[in-house]
């Protein structure tokens, strides 16, 4: 089994500034730390790094730092941080990627913006500049209102390749008290998937469960995504280290409360589910991410 993890975070608070970090996540997660977690993950593996919300002024520094680790970690592509609503400054920022060949896409973290932000002229101008450069957009949203914003974005900008992070962050409950997919979320996912340039990451649900998750709990959500997108537009993502925080880590902030086997456990859960549905496991674990991000 080979695994191309489409959603990896790396950071070092001694190198860059991340105001949002707290609890067990306020630590270094870089080459040395991930080396101890991936020994059992696949016969062949690679990663797509996704920006980790450092300070905006450090976005290019983040790319350069991750690039310095790329060979050691196995990073094959970088989804860079960018504000798409800065007009000429956005264009200059995107043009700086030309000297940074690992950059394959951008994430402007929409979950921190108000509903409707993705329809503003300033954001749309930046999104158009992104599409013109052949770069992808990672849409990280929460709630049906923001999901509807991404549906509208996809409908009105078919030239922009979009991937939905973390299935849109649905409410999943916990392993002990699991939730079933809501009709609103399922309908929104189906509407989004109607646009063929949109893909979806099977990622992030352990964090939504606050570290208390089970493979069985995730399957109804995967099934909705499969029905909507088909097996050719789904990709696995570990969301490491955020989704590696254990329930005790979320509850107490304990410094050591991370699951060392989280990357492998998530890949195994996705692979087992895909096999049980008789769909192409390698597509979801590898080739779809490679195709979407156009990794060489």
Regions found by a protein language model. Give the residues of each.
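Mid-to-C-terminal alpha-helical segments outside catalytic/metal-binding sites
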Residues: 1-6, 19, 27-46, 224, ...
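Active-site micro-motifs of SAM-dependent methyltransferase domains
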Residues: 10-12, 54, 169, 207, ...
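Hydrophobic packing residues within well-ordered alpha-helices of enzyme cores
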Residues: 66, 150-153, 270
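Active-site glycine-centered loops adjacent to acidic/histidine catalytic or metal-binding residues
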Residues: 239
């Amino acid at each position: 089994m080979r695994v191309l993890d489409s959603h990896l975070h790396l950071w070092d608070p001694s190198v860059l500034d991340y105001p949002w970090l707290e609890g067990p996540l306020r630590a270094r997660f870089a080459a040395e730390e991930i080396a101890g977690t991936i020994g059992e993950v696949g016969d062949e593996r690679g990663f797509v790094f996704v920006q980790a919300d450092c300070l905006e002024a450090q976005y290019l520094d983040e790319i350069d730092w991750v690039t310095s680790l790329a060979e050691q970690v196995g990073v094959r592509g970088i989804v860079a941080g960018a504000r798409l609503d800065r007009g000429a400054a956005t264009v200059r920022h995107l043009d700086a990627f030309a000297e940074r060949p690992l950059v394959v896409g951008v994430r402007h973290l929409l979950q921190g913006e108000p509903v409707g932000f993705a329809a503003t002229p300033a954001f749309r101008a930046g999104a158009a500049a992104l599409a013109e450069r052949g770069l992808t957009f990672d849409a990280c949203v929460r709630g049906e209102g923001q999901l509807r914003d991404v549906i509208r974005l996809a409908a009105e900008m078919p030239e922009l390749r979009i991937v939905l992070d973390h299935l849109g962050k649905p409410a999943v409950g916990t392993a002990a008290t699991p939730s079933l997919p809501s009709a609103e979320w399922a309908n929104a996912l189906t509407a989004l998937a109607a646009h063929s340039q949109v893909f979806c990451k099977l990622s992030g649900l352990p964090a939504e469960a606050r570290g208390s998750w089970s493979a069985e709990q995730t399957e109804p959500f995967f099934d909705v995504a499969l029905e909507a997108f088909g097996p050719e537009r789904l990709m696995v993502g570990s969301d490491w280290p955020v989704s590696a925080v254990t329930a005790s880590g979320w509850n107490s902030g304990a410094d050591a409360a991370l699951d060392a086997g989280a990357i492998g456990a998530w890949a195994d859960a996705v692979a087992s589910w895909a096999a049980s549905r008789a769909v192409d496991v390698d597509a979801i674990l590898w080739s779809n991410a490679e195709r979407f991000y156009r990794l060489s």
